[in-house]
Amino acid sequence: MSDSKAKRSMVLIRAVWAVGIVLSFAGLLGAQEAIRAGLSSFPADTQQVAYSNFAQLRSSSDYPQIRQHVLYQQLRGFQEFLRSVGVDPERDINEVMLGWRGESPSGPGSFGVATGTFDPDRVRQFFTQTQLPVQSYAGFDLFAFGSGADPAGTFFTFLDSSLAAFGQLHDLKAILDVREGSAQALDTNQKLRGFEAELEGVSPQWGILTGKAAGNVAAPWLAGGKKNTIDMTAFLQPIQAVLYRVDWDGGFTVHISVACVTPESAAGLFQLLNILKSAPVFSASGGGPGSASLLQNLEAHQNGSRLELDASGPADALDQVLKVGE
């Protein structure tokens, strides 16, 4: 290829990246960068975080199944935006740190940060030429996906030349407020930082849920994936957090750690789980045969104030895990 053709090709490639937030990662930039950025940028009222190392996941033989569930579930509307402009998120995204300020991970409203190599000036030029919506806030340009008028629409911005942030407008502004020092960051939460330290570097996928979100996620696992007549409110109140991690090797293994206030409350949850496992509601799980088998073979033990849960299965059973966890 001649030098002129090569230069024209590079210009075209960069233009495509500009439309798609220029998520043209030059390689893995360190597993801690997205995590550090998320903890120092997310607002303090964030109740849930989820981390995925897509560069590591892509090396798994299970990746064809993983990408259908993990990537699409976590990026949702944002990945639709990327695909609509010809960017392949499963190839070009290496790390993402997501956050939620609500109580359910299945609901809308996730925001996040992604590390990469960006060309902000080229993106601004493209949006100016195409007259796509751009807002200004705290000295940053917020680029809109779509008309920019939808309150649930996705916006993105460049925090620096190697870090992008995205989410709904109010969440993205909250991230900028944190970075400008006018609001507290998530890393001021010492308990959550302690939980994060347990998970960092041990798995390509992990997450933390706190507050009511923790109980909302723990309840379906404890109840066998189906609503039952037992009032679980008293059992769920002592739950401080739910930590989870997922590993892949010819299938998946998920480990869930339910952190309780006291060893006594963890013992109560353990007893409840054993009772429900032998009840018809557990074996008749509403998630289908896959989830019923998965939950029936769930391994559990108490470790002080923690209830530790382990389950494993083939890659195509991941849907059931996600449904049970929602």
Question: Over which residues does each language-model region extend?
Answer:
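A short, solvent-exposed beta-edge/loop patch
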Residues: 50, 149-180, 251, 299-318
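N-terminal secretory signal peptides that target proteins for export/translocation
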Residues: 1-13
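Bacterial N-terminal signal peptides
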Residues: 14-26
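Helix-loop elements that line ligand-binding/catalytic pockets
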Residues: 236-263
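Structural boundary/hinge residues at secondary-structure and domain interfaces
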Residues: 31-145, 149-151, 194-236, 269-297, ...
